[in-house]
Amino acid sequence: MDGIKYEVFTEKSIRLLENNQYTSNVESGSTRTEIKHWVELFFGVKVIAMNSHRLPGKGIRMGPIMGHTMHYRRMIITLQPGYSILTLIQKRT
């Protein structure tokens, strides 16, 4: 899984698990179709919807120079009813 960096476990993402929606951070250059293909191929599930947004990088000061970390994209993936990604649920508990 080259494009998916890691799963996100926040209050909102845990609440979305009840609606069969999974949240993860992906590479900023990945497209929605690539992520959908990777999820369907790797986990063997059917994706019906995807929402994505870009999160800005944080500012880092190095002496007088202001730099920043890389921005990344967060995807909220909705699966068809009856499908689930068990490895992500087990990792949280």
Curated annotation (Swiss-Prot):
Assigned protein family: Belongs to the universal ribosomal protein uL23 family.
InterPro entries hit by this protein: Nucleotide-bd_a/b_plait_sf, Ribosomal_uL23-like, Ribosomal_uL23/eL15/eS24_sf, Ribosomal_uL23_CS
Pfam families: Ribosomal_L23
Subunit comment: Part of the 50S ribosomal subunit.
Gene Ontology biological process: translation
Keywords recorded for this protein, A-Z: Chloroplast, Plastid, Ribonucleoprotein, Ribosomal protein, RNA-binding, rRNA-binding
Classification via SUPFAM superfamilies: Ribosomal proteins S24e, L23 and L15e
Function, as annotated: Binds to 23S rRNA.
Keyword Iron-sulfur: no
Name of the protein in question: Large ribosomal subunit protein uL23cz/uL23cy
Gene Ontology molecular-function annotations: rRNA binding; structural constituent of ribosome
A GO-annotated cellular component: ribosome
Compartments in which it is found: Plastid, Chloroplast
